[in-house]
């Protein structure tokens, strides 16, 4: 092989990445029009379409390389030389970090995810110390020298929206009053604001995101600022809320939310700004939140390696009731769990491995409304053998021997998911005090209702299939039985025809495969007397077929419930 061929292959991979990211940006650029035209059905289609580009272009490039090289493509030493040529192409390249992940994906596709190590892939970036830059001005800076009203007038005037504001003067006043209430005397005419030029679009909202620098008697403090903008029935804009605390901003970038549409020709610079804004979010979380989820996967793996290097605990079975379809393990010191699909499922689970994988794919592409955990899917994931106890390894080999390979120093799992670790809801309920229990039951009911309004029926609603986040939000994480709401047939149980019907252990009525009887939910949800009382008070409508039928009608008519990632206390107009 000649150096010219190595360079040609490197150029082919980078051109494939450019084609992919160009399409990614094209779909992202359409977010403003979809928002302004209130084309909500297209919002969901665009998200799904954008997610598909990455794997599609990896496949195209892989095929090109295989055709170019014939049988020679399996020469690993040649591809290491290609990697060296590729590194040279990235020296001044604005999206170098994501381009490295794309190279990894092509390499793994060619070699079917085998023989992955630090030499052959960009396990770590080739430019770890490079500070990413933006091709244009990333932010605008505003000062309050002419007063806070003038500052926020300019902020709203500078947005790229083509629509008029419903009442800009009112919104400016509400923003200022809210910030004064939250920040006190530190929010004054010495305040400055740095705002990202591009809005962040998700579902029915556009988010203006930046940071406020406060100057109180010479003491400087920087805090986040998030202004969600909504679109009224007359297609006029208004600022719905004002968020200025790190934890609240963090929730907006949460792992149970759909990916943002934000136009970012150099995402590394955007992530760098956001990481200063929300320091409790990792690079993996931020790249994923802005739609670069495949690079988020790379960053998550890098963060995992760093955690391994700085810990010595052993993997254990994750807390909670063991699943019928999946086995879950974790490190006690780590914030994620590893989920593997068992070789054989419990008899009552009449599904295939392919179906389980399709359900996880559905969740990634769907609007998760803050109630379904995102996952990252890995193949041929390698662990150090000494970090596993003999007991855990034996358990995993007992349930999934076909996907686990054990050597003297490694455990290689051919397919797994990584997911944010949460407290299983059934455990949380057992340990909660009365106030936390009430909040938890309310959160659980809201989770089911918001999922249903987004056209997701959880299927198995047992408490063990939900988790509680560090922000005490309830999130669903068991996807093997989810379906679209529109596929289900919600029915009221017919009245018994005879006394014998009433006493019968078997139903006296026909039951179709998609039939659901909400009255039966009480049987398995309301075992705990305290939970039963709270559920009947807060969410008794979940046991009525007509409630579910009304949600189905809304979905059929294109009416989707508004679910926003901030609490009512942050809204500028209280309702």
Curated annotation (Swiss-Prot):
Gene Ontology biological process terms from the UniProt entry: glucose metabolic process; glyoxylate cycle; tricarboxylic acid cycle
Localisation: Cytoplasm
Positions of disulphide bridges: none
GO molecular function: [isocitrate dehydrogenase (NADP+)] kinase activity; AMP binding; ATP binding; phosphoprotein phosphatase activity; protein serine/threonine kinase activity
Cellular component, GO, one term: cytoplasm
Residues reported in the UniProt entry to bind ATP: 318-324, 339
Primary residence: cytoplasm
Keywords on record: ATP-binding, Cytoplasm, Glyoxylate bypass, Hydrolase, Kinase, Nucleotide-binding, Protein phosphatase, Serine/threonine-protein kinase, Transferase, Tricarboxylic acid cycle
Residues at the catalytic site: 374
Reactions mediated catalytically: L-seryl-[isocitrate dehydrogenase] + ATP = O-phospho-L-seryl-[isocitrate dehydrogenase] + ADP + H(+)
UniProt-listed Enzyme Commission number(s): 2.7.11.5, 3.1.3.-
Keyword GTP-binding (UniProt): no
Kinase as UniProt keyword: yes
Role description: Bifunctional enzyme which can phosphorylate or dephosphorylate isocitrate dehydrogenase (IDH) on a specific serine residue. This is a regulatory mechanism which enables bacteria to bypass the Krebs cycle via the glyoxylate shunt in response to the source of carbon. When bacteria are grown on glucose, IDH is fully active and unphosphorylated, but when grown on acetate or ethanol, the activity of IDH declines drastically concomitant with its phosphorylation.
Family: Belongs to the AceK family.
Name of the protein described by the UniProt record: Isocitrate dehydrogenase kinase/phosphatase
Organism: Photobacterium profundum (strain SS9)
């Amino acid at each position: 092989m000649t150096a010219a061929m190595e360079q040609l292959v490197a150029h082919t991979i980078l051109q494939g990445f450019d084609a992919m990211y160009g399409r990614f940006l094209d779909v992202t650029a359409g977010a403003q029009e979809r928002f302004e035209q209130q084309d909500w059905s297209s919002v969901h289609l665009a998200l799904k379409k954008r997610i598909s580009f990455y794997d599609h272009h990896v496949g195209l490039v892989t095929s090109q390389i295989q055709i170019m090289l014939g049988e020679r493509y399996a020469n690993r030493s040649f591809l290491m030389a290609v990697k060296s040529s590729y590194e040279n192409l990235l020296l001044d390249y604005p999206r170098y970090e994501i381009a490295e992940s794309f190279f990894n994906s092509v390499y793994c596709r060619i070699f079917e995810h085998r023989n992955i190590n630090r030499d052959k892939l960009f396990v770590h970036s080739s430019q770890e110390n490079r500070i990413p830059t933006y091709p244009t001005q990333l932010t605008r800076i505003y000062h309050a020298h002419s007063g806070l009203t003038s500052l926020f007038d300019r902020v709203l005037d500078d947005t790229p929206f083509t629509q008029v504001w419903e009442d800009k003067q009112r919104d400016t006043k509400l923003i200022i009053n809210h910030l004064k209430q939250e920040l006190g005397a530190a929010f004054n005419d010495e305040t400055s604001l740095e705002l990202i030029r591009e809005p962040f679009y998700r579902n029915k909202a556009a988010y203006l995101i930046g940071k406020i620098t406060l100057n109180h008697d010479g003491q400087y403090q920087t805090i986040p600022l998030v202004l969600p903008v909504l679109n009224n029935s007359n297609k006029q804009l208004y600022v719905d809320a004002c968020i200025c605390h790190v934890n609240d901003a963090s929730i907006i970038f949460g792992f149970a939310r759909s990916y943002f549409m934000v136009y970012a020709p150099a995402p590394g610079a955007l992530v760098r700004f956001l990481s200063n804004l929300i320091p409790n979010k990792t690079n993996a979380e931020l790249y994923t939140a802005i739609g670069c989820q495949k690079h988020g996967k790379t960053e998550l793996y890098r963060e995992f390696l760093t955690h391994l290097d700085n810990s010595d605990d052993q993997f254990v079975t994750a807390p909670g009731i063991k699943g019928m379809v999946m086995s879950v393990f974790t490190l006690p010191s780590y914030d994620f769990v590893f989920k593997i699909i068992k070789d054989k499922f419990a008899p009552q689970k009449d599904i295939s491995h392919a179906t389980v994988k399709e359900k996880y794919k559905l969740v990634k592409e769907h609007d998760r409304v803050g109630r379904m955990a995102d996952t990252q899917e890995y193949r041929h994931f390698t662990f150090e053998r000494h970090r596993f106890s003999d007991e855990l390894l034996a358990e995993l080999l007992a349930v999934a021997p076909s996907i686990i390979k054990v050597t003297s120093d490694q455990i290689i799992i051919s397919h797994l998911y990584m997911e944010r670790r949460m407290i299983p809801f059934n455990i949380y309920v057992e340990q909660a005090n009365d106030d936390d229990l009430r909040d938890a039951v309310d959160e659980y009911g809201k989770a089911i209702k918001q999922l249903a309004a987004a056209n997701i029926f959880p299927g198995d609603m047992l408490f063990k299939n939900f988790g509680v986040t560090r922000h005490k939000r309830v999130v669903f994480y068991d996807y093997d039985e989810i379906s679209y709401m529109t596929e289900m047939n919600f029915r009221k149980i017919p009245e018994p025809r005879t006394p014998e019907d009433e006493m019968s252990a078997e139903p006296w009525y026909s039951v179709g495969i998609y039939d659901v009887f909400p009255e039966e939910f009480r049987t398995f949800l309301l075992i705990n007397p305290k939970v039963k009382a709270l559920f009947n008070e807060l969410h008794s409508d979940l046991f009525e077929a007509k409630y579910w039928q009304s949600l189905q009608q809304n979905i059929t008519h294109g009416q989707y419930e508004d679910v926003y990632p901030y609490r009512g206390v942050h809204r500028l107009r209280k309702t």
